[in-house]
Amino acid sequence: MLSASCSGLVILLIFRRTSGDSVTQTEGPVTLPERAALTLNCTYQSSYSTFLFWYVQYLNKEPELLLKSSENQETDSRGFQASPIKSDSSFHLEKPSVQLSDSAVYYCALR
């Protein structure tokens, strides 16, 4: 359990690859002070149409879908947002102000 007095946010990142396609994301862990802006980079290579996803896994929990790609920028109820940018094959995850409760493992995935 994380202490309420903890001044940093730790985010762990893991790489995922699929056959013939690839995803590269920010290497972790990333440590930020509370209320700092967060950007987790995700770039991909694919020969086919792509569906992009961000998953989050909190301590002792199963991974859950955070965001999926769409034509427009998508924002979830926790304040995370991501927009697919086809010109540079990216789907970066952003949050303007992180909280201690955002400490988790984040996965960028491609289907």
UniProtKB/Swiss-Prot annotation:
Its main location: membrane. Pfam families: V-set. InterPro entries: Ig-like_dom, Ig-like_dom_sf, Ig-like_fold, Ig_V-set, TCR_variable_region. The keyword Disulfide bond applies. Glycans are attached at residue 41. Residues 21-111 form the Ig-like domain. Disulfide bonds join 42-108. It is found in: Cell membrane. Residues 1-20 form the signal peptide. GO terms for biological process: adaptive immune response. It comes from the Eukaryota. GO terms for cellular component: T cell receptor complex. The keyword Disulfide bond applies. Keywords: Adaptive immunity, Cell membrane, Disulfide bond, Glycoprotein, Immunity, Immunoglobulin domain, Membrane, Receptor, Signal, T cell receptor. Alpha-beta TR is a heterodimer composed of an alpha and beta chain; disulfide-linked. The alpha-beta TR is associated with the transmembrane signaling CD3 coreceptor proteins to form the TR-CD3 (TcR or TCR). The assembly of alpha-beta TR heterodimers with CD3 occurs in the endoplasmic reticulum where a single alpha-beta TR heterodimer associates with one CD3D-CD3E heterodimer, one CD3G-CD3E heterodimer and one CD247 homodimer forming a stable octameric structure. CD3D-CD3E and CD3G-CD3E heterodimers preferentially associate with TR alpha and TR beta chains, respectively. V region of the variable domain of T cell receptor (TR) alpha chain that participates in the antigen recognition. Alpha-beta T cell receptors are antigen specific receptors which are essential to the immune response and are present on the cell surface of T lymphocytes. Recognize peptide-major histocompatibility (MH) (pMH) complexes that are displayed by antigen presenting cells (APC), a prerequisite for efficient T cell adaptive immunity against pathogens. This is T cell receptor alpha variable 18. It comes from Homo sapiens.
